[in-house]
Regions:
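Intrinsically disordered or highly flexible coil/loop and linker segments, enriched in small
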Residues: 33-36, 73, 158
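Short coil/linker segments at helix-helix boundaries
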Residues: 76-82
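Aromatic-lined, polymer-binding surfaces characteristic
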Residues: 53, 64-67, 83-218
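Low-complexity, Ser/Thr/Pro/Gly-enriched N-terminal "stalk/linker" regions
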Residues: 1-55, 88-93
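Generic, low-specificity signal for short hydrophobic/alpha-helical stretches with a mild N-terminal bias
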Residues: 2-9, 42, 76, 104, ...
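HEAT-repeat alpha-solenoid elements in large eukaryotic scaffold proteins
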Residues: 61-74
């Protein structure tokens, strides 16, 4: 499948959007009924199957969030309709994944939970595309989304690039008008600054273990 994408020319936003939709289209059959989980295949993870399926759901947002952040007038009618279909799928997934009464609830967090990593994709997507992923929610759905995401402020987070995941969540809260933790933001920024090694490089919690996530988040 990868072969057909090699050598593809990307010269415009529409080209990038078309490639993204082409890449994620094969995933559609693997979403759960409530769209909160994506089970693309069985593989070994140390953090449990539920978190793995939530990870699958969230990682696609690194592409969809930027896609929805603005209009793509040069896209064909069919691709615009497909982008809209993805919007509805992800709204449904967020609503069900953050609802404790739903069978596809993503679950409560514990200290150093893998789901904290996936919160970054959700936070960035909502920050870039609030009209798609935040404003359509009703009051109760917004409350549940906030409560689920806010769990990251109440649990231990590894003293490495994971702190930027919490920074991104609190930044999102500020942007959409939700309560946010200034204390956590300051604490996490101090940890990130403590990872700086010079010349633009940060380490991932251990001296000399250079990191690529932090500059990406910046």
């Amino acid at each position: 499948m990868i072969e057909k994408w090699k050598g593809r020319t990307i010269q415009s936003r529409a080209d990038a959007a078309e490639l993204l939709l082409d890449m994620i289209r094969p995933l559609k059959p693997y979403y759960s009924k409530g769209n909160a989980w994506l089970h693309a295949g069985d593989s070994g993870v140390h953090y449990g199957e539920k978190s793995s399926r939530m990870e699958g759901f969230a990682r696609v947002l690194w592409g969809l969030g930027p896609l929805w952040s603005q209009e793509s007038p040069a896209l064909s009618k069919e691709l615009k309709e497909e982008a809209e279909e993805w919007k509805q799928r992800y709204l449904s997934g967020i609503i069900h994944g953050t609802d404790p009464s739903h069978e596809e609830y993503w679950g409560d967090l514990v200290d150093y939970d893998q789901k904290m990593v996936e919160m970054a994709a959700l936070a960035v997507a909502v920050s870039l595309s609030p009209k798609t992923l935040w404003e359509p929610l009703n009051t109760e759905q917004k409350k549940r989304f906030f409560c689920w995401m806010n769990q990251i402020n109440d649990h231990g987070v590894h003293p490495n690039n994971w702190r930027f995941f919490r920074i991104l969540v609190n930044t999102m809260f500020r942007m959409i008008g939700c309560p946010w933790s200034k204390e956590r933001m300051e604490e996490d920024r101090a940890v990130i600054e403590g990872c700086y090694e010079g010349d633009g490089w940060y380490h991932d919690g251990n001296k000399g273990q250079l990191d690529y996530y932090i500059p990406f988040a910046i």
